[in-house]
Design a protein with these regions (language model features):
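Secretory targeting signatures
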Residues: 1-23
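Cyclophilin-like peptidyl-prolyl cis-trans isomerases
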Residues: 20-232
């Protein structure tokens, strides 16, 4: 069963890669009508973070109960100033914007434990547009790098939806993907630990900047600081 799911995810990856070349640099951020937790506004007691960049602020809600390691790592790094001055070193339009590497090369960064930590997957967290997720180089290799999904809304075709259903994604998840857009090919490969609830337009603005042949922005996009707080 696992091999079949992996094969289907590979097919979704191919289709999504083709669709990435068919985008416009304008995005209509429609309201998503879904009971999935990533589309709820932060409530009292939730941990939130404001990623302050030189292009604007991106506000995310974090999910420590479902991804405790990833959240602890991100929050501790943020509070220690680890991400201050770090660039978005990898920007791919209609896919992701990636940061968290102090070296700015895509090869650097470490966890707060100075070792890679385990993946944390959940049926409740997925790579919808606006998802905050851990970058990795394979299974259980999470360190400090993270990305935000910036796939175009309405980008989930009937073909992709059918493949997702065949692989076992719940109907509610598929419906949410169809409304919000996203990158389902990243599910169960990367740890989702947060979701943008305000400032998604800033993430899209970053995704539209001009890049070189290595997907690096030609003009630096920088995280000035990340402020973490708990909703009262």
């Amino acid at each position: 069963m696992k091999k079949r799911v992996i094969a289907i995810i590979a097919c979704i990856t191919v289709i999504c890669s083709v669709l990435c070349g068919c985008v416009q640099q304008t995005v209509n951020l429609a309201r998503v009508e879904s009971g999935e937790m990533q589309f709820a506004q932060p409530a009292s007691g939730d941990t939130v973070a404001v990623i302050k960049t030189n292009m604007g602020d991106i506000k995310v809600v974090l999910y420590p109960k479902l991804a405790p390691l990833a959240v602890e790592n991100f929050v501790t790094h943020a509070q220690n100033g680890y991400y201050n001055g770090v660039t978005f070193h990898r920007v791919i339009e209609d896919f992701v914007i990636q940061s968290g590497d102090p070296e700015g090369t895509g090869n650097g960064g470490n966890s707060i434990w100075q070792l890679p930590f385990s993946d944390e997957f959940s049926d409740k967290l997925h790579h919808y547009t606006g998802a905050l997720s851990m970058a990795n180089s394979g299974e259980d290799t999470n360190r400090s790098q993270f990305f935000i999904v910036t796939s175009q809304p309405k980008g989930i075709t009937d073909e992709i939806a059918a493949l997702m259903a065949e692989a076992g994604w719940r109907a509610e998840i598929i419906d949410a993907y169809r409304q919000a857009g996203g990158a389902p090919n990243l599910d169960y490969r990367h740890t989702v630990f947060g979701q943008v609830y305000d400032g998604l337009e800033i993430a899209f603005d970053i995704s539209f900047v001009k890049t070189d042949e290595n997907d690096r922005p030609k003009e630096a996009v920088v995280i000035e600081t990340i402020e973490v707080s708990v909703v009262e």
